[in-house]
Amino acid sequence: MGLFDKIFGNYSKKELAKIEPIKNKVLELESKYADMSDEELGGQTAILRGKLDELSTLDDVLPDALAVCREAAFRVLGKKPYPVQIIGAIVLHQGRIAEMKTGEGKTLVACLAAYANSLTGKGVHVVTVNDYLAKFQSEEMGKVFHFLNTSIGVVLTGMNKEQKREAYNADITYGTNNEFGFDYLRDNMVIYKKDKVQREHAFAIVDEVDSILIDEARTPLIISGQGDKSTKLYSLADRFAKTLKPVTVVEMDDKADNDLLDGDYIIDEKAKTATLTKSGVKKAEKAFNVINLMDADNMTLAHHINQAIKANGVMKKDIDYVVKDGEVLIVDEFTGRIMQGRRFNDGLHQAIEAKEGVEIARESKTIATITYQNYFRLYGKLSGMTGTALTEEDEFREIYKLDVIEIPTNKPVIRVDHPDVVFKTEKGKFNAVIEQVIECHKKGQPVLVGTVSVEKSEYLSRLLKNKGIKHEVLNAKHHDREAMIVAQAGKYGAVTIATNMAGRGTDIMLGGNAEYKSLADLQKMGYSEEVAVEAAGFSNTQDEEVLAARAEYKKLYAKYSDEVKELAEKVREAGGLYIIGTERHESRRIDNQLRGRSGRQGDPGESTFFLSLEDDLMRIFGGERITAMMDTLKVDENTPIQSKMLTGVIESSQKKIEGRNFNIRKNVLNYDDVMNTQREIIYKQRQQVLDGEDLHENILGMIKEFVEDSVNMYITDEDVQDNWNLQGLKERLMGIITVEDDFNYTPQELDEITKQDIIDLLEDRALKIYAKREEDLGQELLHEIERVVLLKVVDTKWMAHIDDMDELKKGIGLRSYGQKNPVVEYRMEGMDMFDDMVASIREDTVRMLFTIQVRKNSAAPKREDVLKPGEHHNMTVRKAKKPGRNDLCPCGSGKKYKNCCGAGNGVQADEAEQEENSSDSSEE
């Protein structure tokens, strides 16, 4: 216990003390609901909803709701939630994170909290890390919900809109973070409200909350459309990159390293970047026949070369990605899973495809995007569960306003966590790992070995094969057998090698898993995997094949359950599951997750981390202290090193990396917050249109603003008619409002006309043309056209704006050299660009509404018939809205406004120059 805890007491303990009375109330209600018949218990949902309508908050019915669900779970599943699980459910209901160790029954905890919150009728989303868990948990817990007359849905990849809409309309919806996020983006691209699938974001329970809200927070959700064809530049740049000589450094010193003469590009291991040296730049200029690679005209070429050297120098096959069936697939660095459907952005994925010699895919165009941080902040109430969250508590508080409550285990954890064993070399480390595996294997103790990459897991597998030890390998190449492999990792004598065990979601039970053994036998009997899984599930079905398989499954399960119980006792006697870590992860949390696979529900277990001074974490982040220690240690590679200083270096290195990664995630969020403000405005406006809000008055307002903006562009100085560019104004509005004979004023007539007269003339004419259009088309049809046109224009402009903002972000970092905050600059310029986009939406909407052709018998109105040229209307003159300083001058000179008619506005030359440069760098 730290000094802070000694003085002030542990935060979790204080909060648990407040929750204790609610838990006790739930336990007191046990006998009340146990005495009810099934029908009476199932009818409690309607009664509780009725009470909720009368009472002010859900808290008033919470104890009854949890007690009802607890009794239902016992009757349906044979599992009665423990008191600690009730506490976990209360924590989730309160919108917090419940830290619960592996094997403590988080699925049942989510079931309790989801049921209680479903009583509001607003919907509950239970978020899992993959489709398998979403389907399995929804089926298992679905039986409880069906018993309680509560509807349940599951959202899976590949479902159509009707299936998804039905799932979202259920009281409780299970699904993955990807599907929930992508469906939100897709919903904000529809033209008709009936095409939306989601409803409001009321309450979410996020399973493996640290994996979803922390680890994946650096990767935004992006819906892409097909962009331009992939250019030959990727292949040419790759061929060139392969001729260059790389130099690897732990951390780059810009000046010293760029002057290196013996390397063409530098690989910075700590920052994971690749940078051309002077030598590399010269070779590029010669190879591609350009004078200056850094010239603005060569930016595309420079970008392709930079991505090619990163693909070849930084990105490692079987660590960062795998190649499967001619396709480059990203490997999640935290879980070791393949990230299906994800691609590296900014052309890096194409560069890797060129490197690996597979087909280079088309470049993509971003249609919609959001970060996980901003998606999950949409929920009115957010909660989560994980085995390890305390190390990231500060981030949960700062970003999501969530606190972390440690839930005590149902039984004490008796796992023995041994001190780290450190070796001088990697070879010595793996020799020791093999010896430890052999020692455990001899006595039948199951072993789970965690590795940090596919490459290391396969190397270890070869060593075990050489020793004749039968084992299973779980990594990104074998992810399709993931659940089966993990489920049997606790068998007597089992040896399992797994890449990054984070978020695996399947409990490792000592003695093996009766369910998975039964499933395997069903498939051997000829049942398909789909039928076997459904047979083991809880869904209601009339399918005869599934019912027959379910009968077989029950027999097999009963048989294997007895076997597993006997074997589990043998495994306990052998010491339980032994966890071996072969390298420290960048995050302490991932290490803790690996350890947490052992010692569930009071079972025995052990864990040891075997490390070497050659491990990436030690080598890259350990710094000079590790190097000095290596020089002074006079030990061979097979002798373990134990040192308090070494342990301290490891922990401080991990804290350093965690801090750096937090800053990266925070930086991503800072930029996305700018986009998020704009996204909320656009999506809110879209929703109002979808909800059927009458747009007609808004459209009339747009017409007036469009006219006024147009006049302001061409009549900048209202007092000097000689400067009026009436010809330019006429041409701008030709085909919409103006006709050829307009503005043919004599000098005398011109002297009597004000700028406001022009505005009034054009506004009046435009409104009359539009009124005639409404008369011809009919009010109902025109209003529907208005709705569709506005949505289409908004979507088109918003997509282009996303690209523009992305381009702005790429170059904005350079502003820091001018002592400017890049995020502040991004926000300011981003808002200017947003204002420009809104004006552009207005203009394009008006133009389309005036020119769109609708096949009707009646002809569209002619502008000449609506208003005769020369008619004026006198109104109060308003101050002209001037064009932007970087806009082309309306006088027609071809110069920028600030360097022409706007030059006399008191702007200093150096300020103008500075703004010119800013504009250019943002375009880059």
What are these regions (language model features)?
Residues 3, 392, 493-494, 678, ...:
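Generic detector of short, well-ordered, non-transmembrane alpha-helical segments enriched
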Residues 1-2, 178, 274, 865-873, ...:
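Compositionally biased, intrinsically disordered low-complexity regions used as flexible
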Residues 444-457, 692, 718-720, 746-751, ...:
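Short, Lys/Glu-rich amphipathic helical modules
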Residues 1-612, 616-634, 684, 705:
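Conserved P-loop NTPase motor core
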Residues 879-898, 902:
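Short Cys/His-rich zinc-binding micro-motifs
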